Amino acid sequence: MCGIYGVVVRPGAAIDPARVAAMGAALAHRGPDDAHVWRDGTAALGATRLSIIDVEGGRQPVTNEDGSIVACQNGELYNYGELRQRLAAAGHRFDNRGDTDLLPHLYEADGLDFPRRLRGMFAVALWDAPRGRLVLARDRLGIKPLHYAETADGLWFASEIKAILATGVHRALDAQALHDYLSLDYVPGPATMFAGVRKLAAGTMLVWDAAAPRGPAIGVRRWWSLPAQHGASAAGQAAGGDGAPPLPRSEAGLVALVRTALEDAVAAHLVSDVPVGAFLSGGIDSSVVVALMQRMAGGRVETFSVGFDDRSYDELPFAKRVAAHCGTVHHEAVVRPAAADLVHDLVDAFDEPFADSSAIGSWIVAREAAGHTKVVLSGDGGDEVFGGYVIYQADRLAAIGRRLPSFLTQRLLPAIARAVPASDRKMALDLRLQRFARGVALDPLAAHLAWREIFTEEAKATLYAAPSGIGVASHADADRPSNRGIDPASNARVGARHAVPSLANRPTLDLLRAAHDAYPHADPINRLMAVDASISLVDDMLTKVDRTSMAHGLEVRVPLLDHPLVELLARVPDVYKVRPIHRGMALKPLLRRVAADLLPRDIVHRPKAGFHVPIPAWLKGELRPLLTDVLAPERVRRQGVFDPAAVDALVRAHLEGRRNPVSYTHLTLPTKRIV
């Protein structure tokens, strides 16, 4: 695991070693074991290294035999052994045993198709000097991050935004990114909160071609997409396609097939030259991973859990039960309101606003694990591929609700939702009813957004400040060459190009609709799961895991996102992921069948709980001074983005226990670092 960074300069420009060094310093936490930079007159590639495979010899960047092709990567390639054998048989020679060392040779053999051969999590940078070509590639599911910025003097890239900002890239707020963040509580790619700094999308490749007829040119192409479901019969058989065999006709056969794929995924993710531990929440995803890895491990696995004093949020008893059942060496940490001290650390780790409060728990459990091991497995991704979110049950219920008389869904249900007292408890009934009452009146995709939406389009319009001259750039502005320049001396705001109340070029729903339209041939719930896999999984869940773990020099591997398993499950009809109404709407029925002989029955059939932090109660208690200070009207007025009166009303509504959900208040906490 590493942090990677670098630059390719335009003709006539020179590489500034100080800027490159600043990038490496900004990523030192991602690779505390080693750091190195390769440079010629046109390109510089650097890596900070956390040594997992070939601990002593696996330095990056690496080259081919004559030094003409250079590569570095952040991640792990689980099939590097078989790829090395194939390349060695073709005459390639390697400098070390590390997985990165094969990349220049694989590129020589397969050209731009080389990512298709890789099994693992990776963000790769490769410089082909003879062709004047830079290649950036990101893994299929977006497990490892990669960012880039095209500027007046070249293309800069890095694992984290902070490394690009360290070069002095001109800063301006990306208006559309802010608009989407307010609805989602994270910034969805390919945008970042900084205009001109972009995220390379999962399963895509960026190619910088210096030899293009009209000068250096950039192209981004998709090299992997989620396979189509193709079709499903009433018996649940999905027809094969793209060379895939038909699925078994029986549920028992399907369970056996998925069990084999799961075992293969966990085994592949255990490849390491250092001990591998595991995060354990007590939910079915991480519990299945731990149960399988303990069966495969040569000794007792170390597991790590986090809990809370608030019993409605605490899952330590369930994690402890699984640990005892599997025979692991178990470690626990408890999150308390003093975690407010972490706010600034989290802002530094994420570089841009990120309001998923579970990042606090992730930070603390990663810190605990990093004191014992360099690598852990986690159960992340299980909800998106097996069908684990409660909102999928809401999607099924809403489909029925839309067939009921309108007075029930548009008058009676909203009235009931308004009558339920506000609550700070986890999975609060008042918030769930409010969101369902709103969503049942919408089309399926709009409802799917509504189940999680923080600020609606209407609410965002009331939240923005009046036009104020703050530096705000739209996506269209950010793409203009005049706005891509390097200005080392300036972190100042740029002149306004859009009035704040009309920040966005599009509503947030359009982002989801594009992902939904890109996956047309599937059952309804499978299509919605594909939307989540391409947006919230990448930019919320996996971003959270990467930043909180790498801040502590810890590698987290996600076997439930092993691409052969993901591609298999994409073909499985949605009735095996979220049961229909008449069968009880159980979540993850297929995974529960797989887990039946691995875990205690109460763990297998335990309802979905989720990993949440008791922020609502904290913000009324120990964290109240933080809330009222950060969102004080005068401070909000100075920032110039939000209407101070609107923000103050939200704060007061929360503190007084009225209707507004807590996300309305804590959501705005991190924005102070951007504007």
Region annotations inferred by a language model:
Residues 1-350, 362, 366, 491, ...:
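Cysteine-centered catalytic environments shared across enzyme families
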Residues 1-4, 21-22, 166-169, 196-201, ...:
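Adenosyl-5′-phosphate
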Residues 99-100, 119-121, 175, 358-363, ...:
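Conserved glycosyltransferase catalytic-site signature
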Residues 108-112, 402-405, 600, 632:
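Glycine-centered helix-coil hinge/cap
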Residues 140, 364-424, 469, 480, ...:
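Active-site adenylate/phosphate-handling loop in enzymes that bind or generate adenylated species
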Residues 282-286, 379, 665:
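Conserved adenylation A10 loop of the ANL superfamily
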Residues 351-356:
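Short, flexible loop segments at the rims of nucleotide/cofactor-binding pockets, characterized by
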Residues 669-671, 675:
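Positively charged, low-complexity/disordered segments
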